[in-house]
């Protein structure tokens, strides 16, 4: 019996919509990363993008446990000496709802061209509406 290897052109991709209202950031991110990668499918192949498209709505209503709203920090650097910027989870959710979720999922995906292709299949929206109704996404409960 030969080992099965998925081909990129043979992969069928589904569209799923997840409502992130009152869900915990890490639990949503880990399940989304798993599905973007395609690990939930029996035809999963590590070097082929076999994952599905994921739409996340209500990302502004995402929660974190404990005191992480104030304590969890995100860092970025301008490239200049002394140019480090620090933002808390709460401030990031106010200014850019959904960016914390995107960063969490991106950190859980492979680095390199395959991971960059996987993160493009993630669509995050702060409100309850999304422009992907033509794809007829199925509701996914986490």
Curated annotation (Swiss-Prot):
Sequence similarity: Belongs to the universal ribosomal protein uL13 family.
MF-aspect GO terms: mRNA binding; structural constituent of ribosome
Function text: This protein is one of the early assembly proteins of the 50S ribosomal subunit, although it is not seen to bind rRNA by itself. It is important during the early stages of 50S assembly.
GO-annotated biological processes: negative regulation of translation; translation
One Gene Ontology term, aspect cellular component: cytosolic large ribosomal subunit
Pfam families to which the protein is assigned, alphabetical: Ribosomal_L13 (PF00572)
Annotated transmembrane regions: none
Keywords: Ribonucleoprotein, Ribosomal protein
Species name: Burkholderia vietnamiensis (strain G4 / LMG 22486) (Burkholderia cepacia (strain R1808))
UniProt-listed InterPro entries: Ribosomal_uL13, Ribosomal_uL13_bac-type, Ribosomal_uL13_sf
Subunit structure: Part of the 50S ribosomal subunit.
HAMAP family: Ribosomal_uL13
Cytoplasm in keyword set: no
Protein known as: Large ribosomal subunit protein uL13
Gene name for this UniProt entry: rplM
Gene3D superfamilies: Ribosomal protein L13
